[in-house]
Amino acid sequence: MSHQETWHETLHDHFGQYFTVDNLLYRDTTGQQDLVIFENAALGRVMALDGVVQTTERDEFIYHEMMAHVPLIAHGGAKKVLIIGGGDGGMLREVSRHPGVEQITMVEIDAGVVTFCKQYLPRHNAGAFDDPRFKLVIADGVNFVSQSSEKFDVIISDCTDPIGPGESLFTSNFYQDCARCLNEGGIFVAQNGVCFLQQDEVVNSHRKLGHYFSDISFYQAAVPTYYGGIMTFAWASQNPALRQLDTATLAARIDETALTCRYYNAAIHHGSFALPQYLLNALSASR
């Protein structure tokens, strides 16, 4: 790619987005995936895997804040957190902002993603890879949870879309193993695509999670990079009360954590579980 060449995302047929490549920083096959990192005047540094944008400097905070703080604040006392994926370090950065968390394990299938993101996307991790609570495991997340005897309070599946290496992170076996690896009162959350364009993905996750969790829902956030509507996150636990905390309780926990965010707050947390009617209809029809 040369200066001002355009890069086109290939996630959806017949519809997509493009970026101008103002400065190509890296492109290669890591051994697992095709990785490209470039600079764009509108969104800063952009990372894509296998033709799909994973993160940009400009708006990554929305995604990472919502994936990390919604389950951690709702739990209210998480000590051990498992991140599946998350090689760019953004999820680790947000989880590490919770002083009550004592152990953060991140399982990333591709060591190359971690290495290159440390070099080319340093703002994402903001030094969190050096946190003494952090442990990096280079392994397949599916295999890790299937073989693990550890228990966690929160599991965050910061997965790619269900294509390539990320496909196995949307299977019934993976969800079953995650449920087994949670402590009592634990919460599982996962990236679940843009529901307007990827509704089947949400419906399938809802159906599969229902076999292993008694409370399944979804929450949403507006992340500009993930075009086509509102970003959807799966939520699963055995306790519906964790999903129904009022804004006063959420605000008190946020204050106690001394958490200051750019997107996430108590009202956003509470309101993010309100879903559009077309998605509610689809979920109801799938039961």
Swiss-Prot record:
CDD domains in the cross-refs: AdoMet_MTases (cd02440)
InterPro entries noted in UniProt: PABS, PABS_CS, SAM-dependent_MTases_sf, Spermi_synthase, Spermidine_synt_N, Spermidine_synt_N_sf
Top EC group: transferase
UniProt xrefs under Gene3D superfamilies: Spermidine synthase, tetramerisation domain, Vaccinia Virus protein VP39
Binding site residues for spermidine: H64, D88, D158, C159, T160, D161
Function: Catalyzes the irreversible transfer of a propylamine group from the amino donor S-adenosylmethioninamine (decarboxy-AdoMet) to putrescine (1,4-diaminobutane) to yield spermidine.
Protein name: Polyamine aminopropyltransferase
Species this chain originates from: Sodalis glossinidius (strain morsitans)
Lineage: Bacteria, Pseudomonadati, Pseudomonadota, Gammaproteobacteria, Enterobacterales
